[in-house]
Amino acid sequence: MIVFYLSGDRVFSTDQNAINGLYNKRHFGKLVEGKLFLSLLEATYLVERGKIEVREGKRKLTVEELMNLGRERDELFDAKYLVYKDLRDRGYTVKSGLKFGSHFRVYRRGMDEHSQWLVWVLPENSRLSPNDITARVRVAHGVRKNMIMAIVDEDADVTYYKVEWVRF
């Protein structure tokens, strides 16, 4: 079992098996100075699947404890996790979309050089202004990506909507 250690709002490992298997082959995390860092979303997903364990000191953390840590830091953590999990389970590579004003960048199966989609996660009861939608679609269009809205309902089902410019 590959061991990761909690460090703030992410986890890390220096295990070469983690770096080779999770980063190089399956495109999880970010490699910084010989350490593989995973977000809490990635760590929760991998712990839930029995691929890694996360420790805080010597204590092993459960999936629920990781979920609670995520919830403390992000009120949308549950919705984001459902979308992250759904996309990963479908075989897509999912990375942070922060620098593009979205929650995720999503790559086709495998890992192309450029992501195909930007995904914005919203609970179904969210209120959206036309300006919010326009701004996000404009950014996606400007970086040649498709904008996807992932709506999570109260039954934890995810529905995806592609939002794009239409020219007449």
Curated annotation (Swiss-Prot):
Q: Highest taxon of the source?
A: Archaea
| Role description | Endonuclease that removes tRNA introns. Cleaves pre-tRNA at the 5'- and 3'-splice sites to release the intron. The products are an intron and two tRNA half-molecules bearing 2',3' cyclic phosphate and 5'-OH termini. Recognizes a pseudosymmetric substrate in which 2 bulged loops of 3 bases are separated by a stem of 4 bp.
Tell me the Gene Ontology biological-process terms attached to this UniProt entry. tRNA splicing, via endonucleolytic cleavage and ligation
What's the protein here called?
tRNA-splicing endonuclease
EC main class here is lyase
Please describe the quaternary structure of this protein: Homotetramer; although the tetramer contains four active sites, only two participate in the cleavage. Therefore, it should be considered as a dimer of dimers.
> What EC number(s) does this enzyme carry?
4.6.1.16
List the keywords (alphabetical): Lyase, tRNA processing
Active-site residues (renumbered): 107, 114, 145
Q: Corresponding gene?
A: endA
Family listed: Belongs to the tRNA-intron endonuclease family. Archaeal short subfamily.
